[in-house]
C-alpha cells in the first residue's frame, strides 16, 4: 500500500501464466519485479466487484479476512494492487502448486495415508478459523490448495463471515451443502463447514464426489439414499421450514455402510459423524483432530508428494 492509502500498481508484477478462471475472477501466476518472488494474482471480475453501494462486500470480506488471519493452513494475502484501468483491482496471494479437485480428477482415489494427512491439515486450519469466530461457508476440493511438499492451504474466503445468529442460506456449493441449509435453516454455525469436510474426505477416499446432486431436491434425495431418512428426533429444536415438505421415499436402503466399510472403521465412523443430520452432533475441528482417523497423521507421506508433483500446474 502506498502512502496516502493508494494501492501499489500491477506494473510491479510480471505475468507468467493464467492459473485458473471463475465467475468471481481469473487467477494468474506472476513474478514481482523487485525481488523475483512468485505469487498468485487474482483479478477481481469488474462485473461482480461492485454493487449499488460501491465495492462488493464479497471482495472486502475476503481481503479483510485474509489480511488478518495468519495460519500455515490458510492462504495468505500479500497485498491488493490496482490495474491500469479505472476500478481494476487484483489480490496478490501466496502461490500454490495445485488444488485438491485437480488431484482427485487426475489420480482418482487418494491413498489412506495421504487422505489422513490432508484431513489433519484441513482441520488445523478450520480450528484456527473457527476459533477466530469465522465460518468459511464454501469448503470444497477446488478451494483446498496444495503445495509440492504436501502442504495444504484453505482458500477462497469470498463467502466467509463472522458467526452470527442469523445468516443467509444461499451458501456452500451444492454438493458440499449441509442438509440443514437445504432444508431452509438460517441459523447455523461452524458445523456447516464440518459437513463439507465430511464430503471432501469421502471424495478423497472414493475418488469422486459422494453427493453430486443436480439440484436441491436431487441433492436431498442423494443424501437420504446415502445416509437414510431423518426422523423428527434428528432435527428436534431446529427450525427447518422445508422439512415438512419432504416426502419420505417408499423403499430404499441407506448405502453408506456398504460404500465406506472397505476404508475401515475409523474412516467410516469419522465421515459418518461429520454427515450427522443434527449439526450439534458433528465433531468440531478440534475434536476431529483427536479422532482415530487423523491420529499420528502429522508426517507427509511420500505418495502425496509424488501425486502433487504430477499434478503441479493443473489449477
Swiss-Prot record:
It is an enzyme of class 2 (transferase). One of its GO terms (cellular component) is nucleus. It catalyses: L-seryl-[protein] + ATP = O-phospho-L-seryl-[protein] + ADP + H(+); L-threonyl-[protein] + ATP = O-phospho-L-threonyl-[protein] + ADP + H(+). One of its GO terms (biological process) is regulation of mitotic cell cycle. The keyword Methyltransferase does not apply. ATP binds at residues 19-27, 42. The active site is at 138 (proton acceptor). It is found in: Nucleus. PANTHER family: CELL DIVISION PROTEIN KINASE, CYCLIN-DEPENDENT KINASE 11A-RELATED. This is Probable cell division protein kinase ECU11_1290.
Amino acid at each position: 500500500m502506498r502512502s496516502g492509502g493508494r494501492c501499489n500498481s500491477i506494473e510491479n508484477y510480471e505475468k507468467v501464466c493464467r492459473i485458473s478462471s471463475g465467475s468471481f475472477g481469473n487467477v494468474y501466476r506472476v513474478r514481482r519485479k523487485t525481488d523475483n518472488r512468485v505469487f498468485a494474482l487474482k483479478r477481481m471480475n469488474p462485473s461482480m466487484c461492485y454493487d449499488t453501494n460501491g465495492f462488493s462486500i464479497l471482495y472486502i470480506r475476503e481481503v479483510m479476512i485474509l489480511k488478518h488471519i495468519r495460519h500455515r493452513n490458510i492462504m495468505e494475502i500479500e497485498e491488493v494492487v490496482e490495474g491500469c484501468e479505472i476500478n481494476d483491482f487484483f489480490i496478490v496471494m501466496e502461490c500454490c502448486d495445485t488444488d485438491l479437485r485437480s488431484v482427485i480428477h487426475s489420480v482418482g482415489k487418494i491413498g489412506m495415508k495421504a487422505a489422513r494427512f490432508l484431513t489433519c491439515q484441513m482441520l488445523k486450519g478450520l480450528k484456527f478459523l473457527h476459533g477466530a469466530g469465522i465460518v468459511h461457508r464454501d469448503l470444497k476440493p477446488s478451494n483446498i490448495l496444495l503445495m509440492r511438499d504436501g502442504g495444504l492451504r484453505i482458500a477462497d474466503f469470498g463467502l466467509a463471515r463472522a458467526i452470527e445468529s442469523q445468516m443467509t442460506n444461499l451458501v456452500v456449493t451444492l454438493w458440499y451443502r449441509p442438509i440443514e441449509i437445504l432444508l431452509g435453516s438460517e441459523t447455523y454455525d461452524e458445523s456447516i463447514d464440518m459437513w463439507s469436510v465430511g464430503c471432501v474426505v469421502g471424495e478423497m477416499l472414493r475418488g469422486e464426489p459422494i453427493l453430486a446432486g443436480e439440484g436441491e431436491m436431487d441433492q436431498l434425495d442423494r443424501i437420504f439414499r446415502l445416509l437414510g431418512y431423518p426422523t423428527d428426533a434428528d432435527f428436534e429444536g431446529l427450525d427447518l421450514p422445508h422439512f415438512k415438505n419432504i416426502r419420505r421415499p417408499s423403499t430404499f436402503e441407506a448405502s453408506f455402510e456398504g460404500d465406506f466399510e472397505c476404508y475401515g472403521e475409523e474412516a467410516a465412523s469419522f465421515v459418518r459423524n461429520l454427515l450427522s443430520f443434527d449439526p450439534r452432533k458433528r465433531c468440531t475441528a478440534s475434536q476431529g483432530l483427536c479422532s482415530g482417523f487423523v491420529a499420528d497423521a502429522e508426517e507427509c507421506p511420500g505418495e502425496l508428494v509424488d501425486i502433487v508433483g504430477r499434478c503441479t500446474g493443473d489449477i
